[in-house]
Amino acid sequence: MRNKNTPIAAEGYPFVAIAGFITVVLALLAWKVLAAFFLVVTLFVVFFFRNPQRITPGDENAVVSPADGVVIYLGNARESHLDEEMMKISIFMSVFNVHINRVPVSGRVVDRFYLPGKFLDVRDERATFENEQNGLVLETARGVKMVVVQVAGLIARRIVCYPKIGDMLQRGQRYGLIRFGSRLDVYLPKNVELRVSMGDKTVAGETILGILP
C-alpha cells in the first residue's frame, strides 16, 4: 500500500478532510451542537482509518492474520479457484477494528479475482458464496499456494486491493482495506499446523494463524 508510514491510511484522507471541513464551517457559524456532532464524526473517521505499525514474526513458515478481528469460522471448506479442500479461517472485523489488510505469507500473486454480489451480514456463512468479494491466490517460494479473500458486508461496501498478478509480496505488508467493517477468509493447505481457535482475537501482521508444512 502507499501509506506505509503515515498514522492515517491515505484512503481516509478525503473522508477526514470532508468531515473536518464541515466541522470548521459549523463552528464558524456558531452552530455548536452540529459542530460538536461533526467533530465526533471526524474523530471517528480518523480512528477508523488509523494505520498502526506492526511487528511481523520472523518464522517464514508462519501464516499471519490479514486482519484485526475475531475468528468466526475454522474448518475444512472447498476453495473454488484452486478447486480443492482447504483449511478455511474467517476473521470478522467490526467497525472498531483497524481495517487495513496485510499479506499472510511472502510470495507471488499468481491469480486475482473479483466477484460481484450481495451485501449480507458477513457473519452469515452464505456471505462466502453470495457477497461481493476480491481475492488473491498467493504462491510461496516453496510452491505452497493459499488464498486470501476480502468479503464486503452489510455496511462495508468498498473493497480496496492494490496487488496485481505477478507482484511479489512480503508477509505483513499492507495490501488493501475494506471500509467500515467486514470479513477476511483465508484458505490454507489442510495439513497446516493451526495456532488459532474459534473466538480468538487476531492482530493483522502479528497473530500467527498457522505454520505451513
UniProtKB/Swiss-Prot annotation:
GO biological process: phosphatidylethanolamine biosynthetic process
Cofactor(s) listed: pyruvate
Pfam family, one: PS_Dcarbxylase
Primary subcellular site in the record, as a coarse category: membrane
The protein's Enzyme Commission number: 4.1.1.65
Cofactor binding notes: Binds 1 pyruvoyl group covalently per subunit.
Gene Ontology CC entries for this record: plasma membrane
GO molecular function, one term: phosphatidylserine decarboxylase activity
Membrane topology label: Peripheral membrane protein
Catalyzed reaction equations: a 1,2-diacyl-sn-glycero-3-phospho-L-serine + H(+) = a 1,2-diacyl-sn-glycero-3-phosphoethanolamine + CO2
Residues found modified as Pyruvic acid (Ser): 182
Key word Acetylation present: no
Chain's role: Catalyzes the formation of phosphatidylethanolamine (PtdEtn) from phosphatidylserine (PtdSer).
Assembly and interaction partners: Heterodimer of a large membrane-associated beta subunit and a small pyruvoyl-containing alpha subunit.
Name of the protein in its database record: Phosphatidylserine decarboxylase proenzyme
